[in-house]
Amino acid sequence: MLLMLTVLSIGFVQAQTKKSKHMKKKILFVVTSHDKKGSTGEDTGYYLGEVSHPWEVLYKAGYEIDFVSPKGGTPPVDGFDLKDPVNKEFWENKEYKNKIDHSMTPSQVDPKEYSTIFYAGGHGAMWDFADNKELAAIASEIYENGGIVAGVCHGPAGLVNIRLNNGKYLVDGKKINAFTNEEESEVKLTNVVPFLLENRLKERGAQFEKSGLWQNHVVADQRVITGQNPQSAKSVGEAILKELHNKSF
């Protein structure tokens, strides 16, 4: 009997070890906690489609997603359109609606659990992503561990101050895109946002790429994946998935 229990115990441990080796690491979505467009008083937050469309791609591929925001808790939402079926699917998914409504604070995140960090857009990101040292440290660790750093639209505001162990900025020398100066001008917020994202990324050494207004444009370079605008959100999710498959996370 003792021998049988020992054999069963060894078998269970081996099975669990084998299972753990094949478990996919999670993906961390970052959303803003900021709810106003500067002095305008207009509401903002994370842009729903820039969460839902990448989420759909990665969720259906079997990846578990967690949410973090600078302040934790329920983040403000912008671009709330449930006529978009993907937005509706995300919003009505009880598990993930609960997750985003109870987003973690950066101090609650263990970077080792994640293969990817993705910064969702929405104008609020321009106020609370760039200077958040805790989020930058999380992203740097994920990247240094061989992971992916991604963002869409204003989300790459979170990339501008990420430094690597060698002291260089993450975006230095890499092809990057994000919400463009022309798009910021088109929505008449050039003088409202605290900085122009395109300019700041260039200052950090990024090789900034862009297409015309509201065109889908995604670039992947050395495990950094960025998209230009809301129209690029799904494609960013697809590019992340492709990179994850290449890395076998």
Kindly give the residue locations of the regions a language model identified:
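Extended, subdomain-level signal for the structured scaffold at the beginning of enzyme domains
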Residues: G11, Q16-N145, A157-F249
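Catalytic nucleophile serine of serine hydrolases
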Residues: C153-G155
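Bacterial N-terminal signal peptides
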Residues: M1-I10
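Conserved, well-structured core segments that form or line functional sites
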Residues: G146-A150
